[in-house]
Amino acid sequence: MPEITISMAAGRTQEQKIGMMRDITQALVKNLGVDADNVVIQINEAPLYHKMKGGKTFVERAAAAKK
């Protein structure tokens, strides 16, 4: 039973997350030959101020991109 955990910054819509999980499920069915009922996917979301890349929080990066 494949179990996939996705860690990502918060901010995507419920529809986007569900679509992503469905696509991943289908990719596992196609490429691993597993039954979709055996695929488990979990999303762990973090607030943008709890994630950092290149020494800047995602909030800081978003603000800089708007300038």
PLM regions with names:
Residues 2-67:
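A domain-level signal for the structural core that forms small-molecule/cofactor-binding pockets
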